[in-house]
From Swiss-Prot:
PROSITE patterns: SPOVT_ABRB
Signal sequence, renumbered to the chain: none
Name under which the protein is recorded: Transcriptional regulator MraZ
Gene name, Swiss-Prot/TrEMBL: mraZ
Keyword Cytoplasm: yes
Predominant subcellular localization, coarse grouping: cytoplasm
Compartment(s) of residence: Cytoplasm, Nucleoid
GO biological process, one term: negative regulation of DNA-templated transcription initiation
Protein family per UniProt: Belongs to the MraZ family.
CDD domains according to UniProt: MraZ_C, MraZ_N
Family matches, as PANTHER family: TRANSCRIPTIONAL REGULATOR MRAZ (PTHR34701:SF1)
Domain SpoVT-AbrB, residue spans: 5-47, 76-119
Complex and partners: Forms oligomers.
Amino acid sequence: MFLGEYEHTIDDKGRLAIPARFRDALSEGVVITRGFDRCLMGFPRGVWEELARQVSSLPIGSEETRQLQRMLFSGAADMSLDRQGRILIPQNLREFAELGDQAVIAGLNRHFEIWSPRRWQNVLSAMDANASLFAQKLAELRF
């Protein structure tokens, strides 16, 4: 389970330390790919395989399906953590997410996202603006 928000440095080679609390869940490997809103998404290999099966089963005749498959699969990087618990984010993915020398890693339960700090602040502002909508969603769940 991925929970919490962490700010980490990206070194000159593009390596990013994964939070220690996340590392056990990534012992079998991690897949990093383009996310929504110009962030990156990280998945444990097993969760990625489940998602890939479901997305691959969608009808290829649909333009939306093809675009989703391109977004997820063409930019995906399959990797393992190094001995220091870091991943090497490929240059094309760093450029996509506009990552410099800092990144925010946000846990989202079954996966995590990697954001530029500037974009993450925008996300937090949008969450504040939509708080009443989120309260309604929780009410729909009878929570």
